[in-house]
Each structure stands twice: as structure tokens, then as C-alpha cells.
């Protein structure tokens, strides 16, 4: 399996896990949050779409100026799924309440993930040459960004599971 195949598999697995996490949620559960500072499942879902669309837009327009700045970052990216460290979202990636129901989100997420996968699998795309900065991890190339998208999704699935495990989480 190539590195691209592995990244595409991680994207597919994280997408399936996300859908499985939100599928059973009632409208009340979809919008519930334990406190004002914590995102609801709906807000997490919106954030994931905003991030993925933003990354793809930036990658498509990133200069193809090399791999050397990004060596060894795959190991660092593995830390992204750990919820012990918080990464505050920039204002442009903070949810605004766009998705009143999971079905609304699923359409946009499917479109975003399909666009990401299609771009990555395009034979004219050299993933290693499209480099752009991450606010925490520094310069990453396109393949590393694909891994980051998958791991970012897994990180937020863990956040949804934390909400579901909360003692005040609504029954339905």
C-alpha cells in the first residue's frame, strides 16, 4: 500500500467513524453541549467541514516548492488525536450554527471529503510539493495534510464521545 493509499484509507475510515458517531443522535443530542465553552456535535461537525474546505482550498493554491521543509512530520501529526492538548480554532473555523440537523451536515461533508480525495488522487497533483504552514506543526506537504485531516476528524469524534459520556447528556 502506498503512502497515498494509506492516507486515503485513513480519510475513509475517519469519515465512516464520524458518520457512525452522529447517526444515532436525536435533534436534542445533536445540539446539546455541557457548557457554553464546549462545542455541540453540530458545531463540531460544522468545524470539520470548515477545516476540510479551507485546507483543500489552500492546498490547491499552495506553491509547489518542495518537500525538504516537511520531513519527519508524520510522527508529530500522530499527537493530534490526543485530547489532552487543546488547539483553539481560529475565528474563521469557529462554527456558527449552520447545520440544524445531521442530514444537512452530511451533504456538505460528503462533498468536502469527495473533493479532498479527488484532488489527492489526481495524477497531476504532486502532494509532496504542495506545502503550506500549520499553526502548530509548521510546514506540511499535501500528503501530511491528508493525514492531518483524518486525525483531526478522529480528534473531534473523541470530543463527541466525551459529550455522549457526560452525565447530563440527554437521553434522546
What role is predicted for each listed range?
Residues 13, 17, 24, 111, ...:
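Residues on one face of amphipathic alpha-helical coiled coils
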Residues 4-10, 18, 43, 50, ...:
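Soluble, non-transmembrane catalytic domains of enzymes that act on hydrophobic metabolites at membranes
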Residues 1, 13-14, 27-31, 85-90, ...:
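Short hydrophobic/aromatic-rich motifs at helix boundaries and adjacent loops
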Residues 1-4, 98, 135-142:
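A short, mixed-charge helix-start or loop-turn motif at secondary-structure junctions
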Residues 10, 76-129:
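Acidic/histidine-rich alpha-helical segments that form the ligand environment
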Residues 31-81, 121-172:
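Short, contiguous alpha-helical
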Residues 1-12, 16-38:
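An N-terminal domain-cap segment
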Amino acid at each position: 500500500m502506498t503512502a497515498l493509499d494509506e492516507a486515503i484509507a485513513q480519510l475513509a475510515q475517519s469519515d465512516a467513524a464520524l458518520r457512525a458517531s452522529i447517526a444515532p443522535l436525536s435533534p436534542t443530542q445533536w445540539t446539546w453541549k455541557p457548557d457554553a465553552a464546549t462545542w455541540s456535535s453540530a458545531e463540531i461537525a460544522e468545524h470539520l467541514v470548515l477545516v476540510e474546505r479551507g485546507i483543500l482550498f489552500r492546498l490547491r493554491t499552495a506553491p509547489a516548492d518542495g518537500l525538504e521543509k516537511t520531513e519527519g512530520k508524520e510522527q508529530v501529526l500522530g499527537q493530534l488525536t490526543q485530547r489532552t492538548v487543546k488547539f483553539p480554532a481560529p475565528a474563521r473555523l469557529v462554527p456558527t450554527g449552520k447545520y440544524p440537523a445531521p442530514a444537512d451536515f452530511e451533504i456538505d461533508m460528503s462533498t468536502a471529503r469527495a473533493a479532498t480525495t479527488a484532488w489527492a488522487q489526481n495524477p497531476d497533483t504532486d502532494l509532496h510539493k504542495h506545502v503550506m504552514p500549520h499553526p502548530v506543526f509548521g510546514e506540511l506537504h499535501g500528503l501530511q495534510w491528508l493525514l492531518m485531516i483524518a486525525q483531526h476528524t478522529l480528534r473531534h469524534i473523541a470530543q463527541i464521545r466525551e459529550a455522549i459520556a457526560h452525565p447530563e447528556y440527554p437521553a434522546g
